Regions:
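Conserved CoA-thioester-binding segment of acyl-CoA-metabolizing enzymes
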Residues: 1-52, 79
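Terminal peptide-recognition signature
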Residues: 13, 17, 31-32, 49, ...
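Hydrophobic alpha-helical membrane-association signature
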Residues: 28-32, 70-73, 103, 176, ...
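Helix-loop "lid/cap" segments that line or gate small-molecule binding pockets
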Residues: 149-150, 161, 201-205, 217-223
Length: 246
């Protein structure tokens, strides 16, 4: 489910659930957390995360999304990628939706194909992302694009993501992983203590990614709402949801 490959000081981690477009469940999160912990313990210089079968990650597996343990594991993974002492890179093709976009913005560097798709479609289901994601996304793309993605459930192609700064580099279809590993090799040759210090400074410049009382209230209201149940039911029944704001 989670494949790892060492290439010198670069570690490639691949989410391998192509039948689910690499949607995350508990096992996938456990595997990713284990791969990250092993990279930290092994002295890896750059960690590259990608997905198998033409997709990065299509989000959370909706059979586990309501589980508090899943949410806690996902946050641990995102924060671990953000705060790892070495640079982390997302190599994105196909769908990077919901938790897929969260994984991407947790990484320091992002490379994608022009046809990749980024988005946070929580509003289509009655879900709500945490304050960590809202803050990190806004820092990556700016308030205007973040509001379009979060309030209007708009998606960004890889090409558009490159234009707005969500993606740093583009790679041709079929050459993504090779391009990502080539870039990672370049990054791995730089001074690791300089990189570690720069990450600390950049992360501190983002400010507190924790919960404010107002956001926690709004978040918990969304997650305990009838609209959430309606959104999940509509998804399972493959029909449009009928949200009532309650």
């Amino acid at each position: 489910m989670i494949l790892t490959e060492s290439r010198g000081s670069v570690r490639l981690v691949t989410i391998d659930r192509p039948e689910r477009r690499n949607a995350l469940d508990h096992d996938a999160l456990d595997g990713l957390l284990g791969a990250l912990a092993d990279a930290v313990a092994s002295g890896v210089r750059v960690l590259v995360v990608t997905g198998a079968g033409g997709h990065f990650c299509a989000g959370a597996d909706l059979s586990t999304v309501e589980d508090e343990g899943f949410v806690a594991k996902l946050h641990e993974l995102l924060e671990g990628l953000r705060t790892a002492r070495f640079p982390t890179m997302a190599a994105v093709d196909g769908a990077a939706l919901g938790a897929g976009t969260q994984l991407a913005v947790a990484c320091d560097l992002r490379i994608a194909t022009p046809g990749a798709t980024f988005g946070i479609p929580a509003g289509r289901l009655g879900l709500m992302t945490d304050q960590w994601t809202v803050t990190r996304l806004a820092a990556a793309v700016g308030q205007s694009v973040a509001r379009a993605m979060l309030l209007a459930a708009e998606t960004c192609s890889g090409e558009r993501a490159h234009q707005v700064g969500l993606v740093t580099r583009l790679a041709p279809p079929g050459e993504l992983v090779a391009a990502a590993l080539g870039w990672a090799d370049e990054v791995a040759k730089l001074a690791p203590l300089t990189q570690a210090a720069a990450k600390v400074g950049l992360n501190e410049a983002e400010g507190d990614l924790g919960w404010t009382p107002a956001f926690r209230h709004a978040f918990e209201r969304a997650w305990s709402s009838a609209d959430l149940q309606e959104g999940l039911a509509a998804f399972a029944e493959r029909r449009p949801p009928d949200f009532e704001g309650r």
